[in-house]
Regions:
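Acidic, PIN/NYN-like endoribonuclease modules and their adjacent C-terminal/linker elements
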Residues: 2, 104-142
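Active-site neighborhoods of divalent-metal-dependent phosphate/nucleic-acid chemistry enzymes
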Residues: 73-116
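Active-site-proximal, substrate-binding regions of enzyme catalytic domains
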Residues: 25, 45-73, 78-80
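Short, well-structured N-terminal submotif of metal-dependent ribonuclease cores
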Residues: 1-39, 53-60, 121, 135-142
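A general alpha-helix detector
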Residues: 9, 47-48, 84
Length: 142
């Protein structure tokens, strides 16, 4: 099972955001335990670096993002993905379209996001974190 984890789910863990933290943490644990192959889009890193600025120092942000990179693989963004996303008129949000491009590139089964409605045009189905855990809770047991 391969999943691309959207920036908002990663931020839930890094910021300890309630009520989302526990579910997001469980998904990252599945990735860390290699029960699920987790990926994130490369542009999630600078987005998170910026999002975390109010709660962490630069040094803390660097360390925590390096830690995340040990848990989930980073899928790069190249000119092909950018052009393809720019050509894709089915997405209102360019950043979401880049997430989808990265999910396609890694042959993800799902994009795990709290904004599944933003991915209705996606070639990869989007799933809410709680739906993913409910659907694949048996993976947690093994």
């Amino acid at each position: 099972m391969r999943v691309l984890i959207d920036t908002n789910v990663l931020a839930d863990v890094l910021l300890g955001r309630d009520p989302y933290y526990d579910i997001a943490y469980s998904i990252l644990t599945m990735c860390a335990d290699k029960k699920v192959y987790g990926y994130m889009a490369a542009h999630s890193i600078p987005n998170l670096f910026y999002i975390l600025r109010k709660s962490m120092t630069k040094e803390e942000r660097r360390e925590v993002l390096k830690d995340i990179c040990q848990i989930v693989k980073v899928e790069g963004i190249d000119s092909f993905k950018i052009i393809s996303a720019l050509d894709n008129v089915d997405f209102d949000d360019f950043e979401d379209c880049l997430q989808e491009e990265c999910a396609v590139a890694v042959s993800a089964d799902y994009i795990v996001t709290r904004n599944a409605k933003d991915f209705v045009s996606s070639r990869i189905p989007a799933i809410l974190p709680e739906q993913f855990l409910e659907k694949y809770k048996d993976i947690m047991q093994t």
